[in-house]
């Protein structure tokens, strides 16, 4: 009975449920639930995407601003250096223009006199260098005279007198060198070589000893008569190269036990 009553109760409950919520209504309710949940999820995803995009845009704007500020600072540092370098170049360009003196206009006669006066000291310097080189080539016996140098600023009649004195000194130095050359040339005497190898060179009277002038020629004659004797060569002793060979003193004694 209990089982039947329970089955009846379940059937009644189902019928009551179906009456209250028919199957069509139940399916519609489930579909609405799914739709509402999906819509809520989509909205959440959309909001999260929007927030992520906003954050990315903020980061980009911040980075761009930072890079722009760094570039502006670098440009600001480069610009003053370039401006300073340009100002330095301008100063350098201005300085040579200021340093150039204004050339005054002279006549041609003034230029000619200046060139003539410049050529005179050059000729004096050349003559002085010639005089200085000649005494170095002369021998030590000849007295060397150093030319007196005069300042280049003194010009006029003194130059002619100086040239005359230089020519006189040159002439005197040439004469002294001509006198010294024959003194240096001395006759060189060469000793006559012996004609034959066997003959001994004859000694002069100066080589002889004054103590015994009579004994020397006799000794020389005896030496010439006696033939030269060669020294006898002693036979070299041979040694045994083998270290094991016994000495040649006598027979080796044999011991018998």
Curated annotation (Swiss-Prot):
GO molecular function: adenylate cyclase activator activity; adenylate cyclase regulator activity; alkylglycerophosphoethanolamine phosphodiesterase activity; G protein activity; GTPase activity
Compartment(s) where it occurs, according to its Swiss-Prot or TrEMBL record: Cytoplasmic vesicle, Secretory vesicle; Secreted
Keyword Secreted assigned: yes
Comp. bias (Basic residues): 227-237
Signal sequence bounds: 1-46
Biased composition (Acidic residues): 104-139
Biased composition (Basic and acidic residues): 86-103, 200-211
Main location: cytoplasm
Residue ranges with Low complexity bias: 70-82
Protein name in UniProt: Neuroendocrine secretory protein 55
Gene: Gnas
């Amino acid at each position: 009975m209990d089982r039947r009553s329970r089955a009846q109760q379940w059937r009644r409950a189902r019928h009551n449920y179906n009456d209250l919520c028919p199957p069509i209504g139940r399916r519609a309710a489930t579909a609405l639930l799914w739709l509402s949940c999906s819509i809520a999820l989509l909205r959440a995803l959309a909001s999260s995407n929007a927030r992520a995009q906003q954050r990315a845009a903020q980061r980009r704007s911040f980075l761009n601003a930072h890079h722009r500020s760094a570039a502006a600072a670098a440009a600001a540092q480069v610009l003053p250096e370039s401006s300073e370098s340009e100002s330095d170049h301008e100063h350098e360009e201005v300085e040579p223009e200021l340093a150039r003196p204004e050339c005054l206009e002279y006549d041609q006669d003034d230029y000619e006199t200046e060139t003539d006066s410049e050529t005179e000291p050059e000729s004096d310097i050349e003559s002085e260098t010639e005089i200085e080189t000649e005494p170095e080539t002369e021998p030590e016996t000849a007295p060397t005279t150093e030319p007196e140098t005069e300042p280049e600023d003194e010009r006029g009649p003194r130059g002619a007198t100086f040239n005359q004195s230089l020519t006189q000194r040159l002439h005197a130095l040439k004469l002294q060198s001509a006198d010294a050359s024959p003194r240096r040339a001395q006759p060189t005497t060469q000793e006559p070589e012996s004609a034959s190898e066997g003959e001994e060179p004859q000694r002069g009277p100066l080589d002889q000893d004054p103590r015994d002038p009579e004994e020397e020629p006799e000794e020389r004659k005896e030496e010439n008569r006696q033939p030269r004797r060669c020294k006898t060569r002693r036979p070299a002793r041979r040694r045994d190269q083998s270290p094991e060979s016994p000495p040649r003193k006598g027979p080796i004694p044999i011991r018998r036990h």
